[in-house]
């Protein structure tokens, strides 16, 4: 049985006064029934991503699988934008030799959303390009076959997306937010909407889609 995923349909939440919102996933990753791999290599040494890969093994393969993290290069700006997130996740898998490779890359996706009349923070979030949604792009390579998806996201306050753009994407929106608000630069999502980054990553493949 999977986790409680009711939050996936709860778009608008403002309990802490930031005005941010959770936006449902963009493209689910659909994998067929597969035998568990002998090992999983994650294209990052960050503990959060290694833990996410362990959870992926349980969710998709139904088994615990040895997981190792390695340092890789994304080939995209520090703050990926739109298609750069998936491109960066794919780039990170190049040259990594394992039966299963898992790659994560967060990025800003500029999108349009249906804003409810009760949303009082419209001007703080909606700019000329729409709203900036921070989402995780995930690529999984299993025995040479590639799968990809883009998970649920969190609206990024306009000022921080614009600060990142002004730096020519060298400064991430998360680091700009951390400097202003004191939230963790790599997991500010929990502070704004009560859903942490690990859950947002997991939303790419869970609940599992039927094939």
Task: Name the predicted role of every residue range.
Residues 2-18:
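Helix-enriched interaction subdomains in cytosolic or periplasmic regions
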Residues 21-98:
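N-terminal polybasic phosphate/anion-binding patch
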Residues 79-211:
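Anionic-ligand binding patches
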């Amino acid at each position: 049985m999977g986790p409680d995923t009711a939050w996936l349909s709860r778009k608008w939440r403002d309990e802490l006064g930031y005005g941010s919102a959770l936006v449902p996933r963009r493209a689910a990753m659909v994998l067929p029934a597969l035998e568990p791999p002998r090992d999983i290599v994650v294209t990052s040494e960050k503990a959060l991503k290694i833990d996410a890969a362990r959870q992926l093994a349980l969710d998709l393969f139904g088994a615990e699988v040895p997981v190792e993290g390695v340092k890789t290069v994304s080939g995209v700006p520090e703050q990926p934008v739109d298609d750069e997130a998936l491109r960066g996740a794919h780039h990170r898998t190049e040259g990594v030799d394992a039966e299963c490779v898992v790659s994560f890359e967060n990025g800003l996706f500029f999108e349009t959303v249906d804003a409810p009349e009760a949303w009082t923070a419209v001007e703080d979030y909606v700019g000329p390009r729409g709203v900036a949604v921070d989402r995780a792009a995930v690529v999984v390579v299993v025995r040479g076959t590639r799968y990809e998806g883009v998970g649920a996201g969190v609206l990024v306050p306009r000022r921080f997306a614009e600060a990142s753009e002004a730096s020519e994407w060298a400064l991430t929106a998360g680091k700009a937010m951390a400097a202003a608000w004191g939230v963790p630069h790599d997991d500010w999502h929990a502070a704004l909407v009560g859903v942490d980054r690990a859950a947002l990553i997991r939303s790419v493949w869970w609940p599992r889609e039927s094939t």
